[in-house]
Structure formats: structure tokens, C-alpha cells
């Protein structure tokens, strides 16, 4: 099994080529923030180009799959200038597109609540 190190997600691939992509902010119910969005995009790009990966399972650590957007992240974006709001929105769109366009089957293993962006994934 191989794994890659991130702060807000974990990525592990077993010997069968099954990659487990786990949202790892359980104290925040895996709510999306800028860092989680960036790391999901990076992981999607890595998994897409890894020929040893045959399928990706997306799940969340803890009681919730994903509570949607982190309110502190929303609050910070609301107070930011227009260019920052556009940049943050674009990062979210690119991450969702990277997951949607993954050239391997993507299976959602949803445990517990999924709201907002968590439903979108």
C-alpha cells in the first residue's frame, strides 16, 4: 500500500490499485476550505496520472462525509476583494471538475451527512 501526505486529506492506494481518497477534517465535519480544496485538486491530478490506480473511492473521516463549505472560509471570502473571491470560487470549480473528469471510476462512499459542496462531490 502506498500513501501520499497531505494535511486535510489522506490518499492510500492498495496493491489492487484501489485508491482511497479521504477527507480528513473530522472536527469540522470535513467542511471544505481553501486548503482542502487545493489538496483535493492536487490529489485528483496525481491519481489521474498514476497508472497503478484503477479506481478511486472518495470518503470522509469521522461521523460526516462533508458538511459543505466551512463557514469561516465563507466569512473570509465574503470580506475579501473581488479578485480573491473569484480566485477562490475558481479553485472550487477546478477541484470539482478534476474529480468529475477523473479518467478512472470514482466511487463515493458516503457515511453520515453530506451537505452543499459535499453533495456536489
Can you describe what each PLM-predicted range is?
Residues 60-98, 114:
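Glycine- (often His-adjacent) and acidic-residue-rich active-site loop
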Residues 1-61, 97:
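Conserved CoA-thioester-binding segment of acyl-CoA-metabolizing enzymes
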Residues 24, 69, 111:
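Histidine-centered beta-alpha loop that forms part of the nucleotide-sugar donor binding/catalytic region
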Residues 95-121:
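Glycine-rich beta-to-alpha active-site loop
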Amino acid at each position: 500500500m502506498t500513501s501520499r501526505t497531505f494535511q486535510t486529506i489522506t490518499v492510500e492506494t492498495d496493491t489492487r490499485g484501489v485508491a482511497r481518497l479521504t477527507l480528513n477534517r473530522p472536527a469540522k465535519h470535513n467542511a471544505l476550505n481553501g486548503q482542502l480544496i487545493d489538496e483535493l485538486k492536487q490529489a485528483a491530478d496525481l491519481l489521474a496520472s498514476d497508472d497503478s490506480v484503477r479506481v478511486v473511492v472518495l470518503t470522509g473521516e469521522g461521523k460526516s462525509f462533508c458538511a459543505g463549505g466551512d463557514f469561516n472560509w465563507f466569512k473570509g471570502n465574503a470580506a475579501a476583494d473581488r479578485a480573491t473571491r473569484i480566485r477562490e470560487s475558481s479553485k472550487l470549480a477546478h477541484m470539482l471538475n478534476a474529480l468529475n473528469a477523473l479518467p478512472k471510476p470514482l466511487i463515493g462512499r458516503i457515511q453520515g451527512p453530506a451537505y452543499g459542496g459535499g453533495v456536489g462531490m
